[in-house]
Design a protein with these regions (language model features):
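Divalent metal-dependent hydrolysis catalytic cores, especially in the metallo-beta-lactamase
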Residues: 57, 73-102, 116-129, 156-168, ...
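C-terminal cap of metal-dependent C-N hydrolases
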Residues: 6, 339, 349-395
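His/Asp/Glu-enriched, well-ordered alpha-helical/loop segment
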Residues: 225-238, 254-266, 271-360
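Active-site gating loops and adjacent loop-to-helix segments of metal-dependent hydrolytic enzymes
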Residues: 77-88, 130-157, 199-212, 222-235, ...
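Active-site core of metal-dependent hydrolases
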Residues: 150, 154-276
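Conserved, mostly hydrophobic/aromatic
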Residues: 123, 179, 208, 318, ...
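Histidine-rich, glycine-flanked metal-binding segment
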Residues: 1-48, 393
Length: 395
């Protein structure tokens, strides 16, 4: 396929108006593309690489923690239609056997053509602090346990890419030193001070899980893990749904940590893509009203319980309502997460040799069509309207 007259996000992390050529599942150059069946004139639309959500729990009624292949399928299908082509399945603080079951399900799951790819697992919990457990169930919190982590990683087929730890726990630094040899260790669900966080970063931690949330605030005389993250060049995950973070906080984070260290995430739960109502997250009841998901019982009453926003919608919100430049938002949602996973530039850029997964958007970042691994999975009617030639030579 050829897509003409579109603004394409390129290897310089900026937009250029040009034609994009695809063959099978890859992006190719004109010389490699000897013929094609379809040429589309996209008339100044935007071509954005498929996003990469490294931290989501669920969507459209499913949760990865359900350990149910049917739930995995509908989550991945929804994510693909939302312009997200790679995801990491996030777990919760749950009973050990349930966590192991999740690992086995993810290890065995085979992705279909219309589903986002599983790039790994984000193990959020159970190695967290009860004082900052948020929507995690404190009943199943564990001290950092390297043997348990190794067993989970084996069961997952070595798919664990991220693990969250609270640095103030006595055994945390020894755990971080060993775990960081195999995956990225992240800090959150913690009440640690600056010094404890700095020690964790010196031992190998390199990321802040949903920065600013479930951790101490950045105060003048007690700067906490956020300042330590800045001092040790850690990456910072941001949930840009308009609920978790004030828009000024997001803009400040981009400046404080630097664009290359910002990772946009959704942290979405099973209500994402659905409506208001009562749901569950990690076995706890959650009430969703509009853009907010809040715990509705127990000591965590009123605590934010993940988001109900896809990563693409969060990126759009950051651009349209938080004044983050589009090119920077895409870098934070498509490029940086894949660099963290070590799969860039095969994924996350619209350049020769990269995977042909991208979203066609209108002026206001409304999704018009989605191409996943070279196949049209959404927006066929839109593309039919923009089909100008078929069965022609590409000379």
């Amino acid at each position: 396929m050829i897509f003409k007259n579109a603004y394409v996000y390129d290897e310089k992390q900026s937009f250029i108006k040009k034609a994009l050529f695809t063959h099978e599942s890859s992006i190719v150059n004109k010389e490699q593309h000897s013929s094609c069946d379809h040429i589309f004139d996209l008339a100044d639309h935007w071509l954005i690489p498929g996003l990469c959500d490294i931290h989501l729990h669920g969507a459209v009624g499913g949760d990865f923690s359900d350990a149910d292949p049917a739930c995995v399928k509908k989550i991945l299908r929804y994510e693909a239609q939302e312009g997200i082509s790679n995801v990491c399945a996030a777990t919760m603080t749950l009973p050990e056997e349930q966590i192991k079951k999740i690992m086995r399900i993810i290890s065995d799951y085979k992705v279909s053509d219309d589903e986002a790819s599983l790039a790994g697992i984000y193990m959020e919990g159970p190695f967290i602090a009860a004082s900052k457990c948020g929507a995690q169930d404190p009943a199943y919190i564990k001290d950092p346990d390297l043997n348990f982590l190794k067993r989970c990683n084996e069961l997952s087929g070595h798919k664990i890419k991220f693990v969250t730890v609270a640095p103030e726990i006595a055994t945390a630094c020894d755990f971080i030193k060993e775990a960081s040899k195999q995956m990225r260790v992240c800090i959150a669900h913690t009440n640690c001070n600056y010094e404890q966080a700095a020690e964790a970063f010196r031992h190998g931690a390199m990321q802040l899980t949903h920065a600013f949330n479930a951790m101490p605030a950045f105060l003048s005389r007690s700067p906490g893990p956020l300042a330590a993250g800045f001092d040790y060049a850690a990456a910072a995950e941001l949930i840009c749904d308009g609920v978790h973070l004030h828009e000024a906080t997001v803009r400040s984070a981009f400046k404080l940590f630097g664009l290359d260290q910002i990772l946009m995430i959704s942290d979405s739960m099973r209500a994402c893509g659905l409506g208001d109502g009562e749901y569950t997250l990690g076995g706890q009841k959650v009430k969703v009203s509009g853009p907010k998901a809040l715990l509705c019982e127990g000591s965590g009453n009123g605590t934010i319980a993940g988001s109900v926003t896809s990563l693409f919608s969060a990126m759009r919100h950051a651009v349209l309502h938080m004044r983050i430049p589009l090119s920077e938002a895409i870098t934070a949602a498509a490029v940086n997460p894949r660099k963290a996973l070590g799969i860039y530039p095969k994924y996350g850029i619209l350049n020769q040799g990269s995977e042909a997964s991208f979203t066609i958007c209108g002026k206001w970042l409304d999704i018009k069509a989605v191409i996943l691994r070279g196949r049209i999975i959404w927006g066929e009617e839109f593309l039919k309207e923009h089909l100008i030639r078929r069965n022609v030579a590409c000379s």
